[in-house]
Amino acid sequence: MKQRLLCLMAAIFMAFAWSIGLGTQQASAANILIHMKTSLALDDAQICAVPNVAWTAVKAGHTVTILVDASAVTSVTKGFGWFRGLIGSDSTALDRASLPERERESLSQQMGVPLDQIPHNYGEYFDFLKNKLGVEIYGNQTMMLLYKIDPARVASAVTPVPLDRMMQLFTEADRIIVY
């Protein structure tokens, strides 16, 4: 009798645990929006974390979108700034920001990718995210207007979007990460 009661209690516990999801892995993919707001000139640590988080999320099976907003739009603009504009630079601040070799080695190890396939600068990194991993990258068109940025001067990985499309990105996201 005692043994039957123990078996019955164990069965009830197992049924309860299964019904509330204990012991099952919740592995559904999320739609993640990374809201990148801070320019490289203001805080390089924030903007440089964005591609690492994006890659890690993609590797975990999530869909990732990056929204470049606020002062960060200046970091994806070719020749931004009076001096770069004067000399006609065709690079962005992200293109000029190298990935330290120790970070490249760490990414190679963590992501299981040969070192020669790891980008050398953050501009290449954003291209890699978009072209190899399928990350969508958008930029706030209104903020570009405020900074007097011609959308044609924005990095090719970034698609300028109006405010209504930005709002759609926010409402469609399951999770929003802000940098």
Show where each model-derived region lies:
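Positively charged n-region of N-terminal signal peptides that target proteins for export
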Residues: M1-R4
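Short hydrophobic/aromatic patches at helix-to-coil boundaries
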Residues: I176-Y179
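A ubiquitous, low-specificity "background" feature that marks scattered single residues
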Residues: L8-M9, S75
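Bacterial N-terminal signal peptides
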Residues: M9-G21
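Secreted/extracellular ectodomain signature
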Residues: Q25-D174
